[in-house]
Amino acid sequence: MTGKTVTRADLAESVFRKVGLSRTESAELVETVIDEICNAIVRGETVKLSSFATFQVRDKNERIGRNPKTGEEVPISPRRVMTFKASNVLKTRILKAHVTRKVKLKPQNPTP
C-alpha cells in the first residue's frame, strides 16, 4: 500500500491533465459528479458505476449487541447504512496490482 490518499483536488487535476478542461472546469466537473452520486444515495437510489462499484443504502434492523469490556447486552438502534461493493473488474485489477507488487518486492537469490 502506498499510503497516499486521493483527494477531490487530485481528481480535478487528473481531469485537467487528461481531458483538457480548465482547472476550474475540472474542479466543477468533479464536484458535480460527486454531488450527483451523493444526491442519488440520499434519495435511497442504488448507484452502479459499471466496472467500478455499486453504492447502496441498506436498512439495518434493531438488534442486541454486547459491550466487549463488560459483556453487557445493549440495544443497537435501527439505522441506514451505505454499502460499497467493488465490481469484479475492480477486484481483478486490485489483485493483479498486488501480485505484480509482490513479485517486484520478492528478493532475488544470487546465482553462484
Curated annotation (Swiss-Prot):
Q: Which InterPro entries would you find in this protein's record?
A: Hist_DNA-bd, Histone-like_DNA-bd_CS, IHF-like_DNA-bd_dom_sf, IHF_alpha
Its GO biological process annotations read: DNA recombination; positive regulation of metabolic process; regulation of DNA-templated transcription; regulation of translation
Q: Does the keyword DNA-binding apply?
A: yes
Q: Give a Gene Ontology cellular component term annotated to this protein.
A: cytosol
Alphabetized Gene3D superfamilies for the sequence: IHF-like DNA-binding proteins (4.10.520.10)
**Keywords from the UniProt entry:** DNA recombination, DNA-binding, Transcription, Transcription regulation, Translation regulation
* Segments passing through the bilayer: none
What PROSITE patterns does the record point to? HISTONE_LIKE (PS00045)
Could you state a single Gene Ontology molecular function term? structural constituent of chromatin
By its UniProt entry, which PANTHER family does this protein fall under? DNA-BINDING PROTEIN HU, INTEGRATION HOST FACTOR SUBUNIT ALPHA
NCBIfam families assigned:
himA, PRK00285.1
Biological role: This protein is one of the two subunits of integration host factor, a specific DNA-binding protein that functions in genetic recombination as well as in transcriptional and translational control.
Could you give the subunit structure recorded for this chain? Answer: Heterodimer of an alpha and a beta chain.
The family line of this record is: Belongs to the bacterial histone-like protein family.
Protein name stated in the entry:
Integration host factor subunit alpha
- List the source organism: Rhizobium etli (strain ATCC 51251 / DSM 11541 / JCM 21823 / NBRC 15573 / CFN 42)
Lineage in the entry?
Answer: Bacteria, Pseudomonadati, Pseudomonadota, Alphaproteobacteria, Hyphomicrobiales
Gene name per UniProt: ihfA
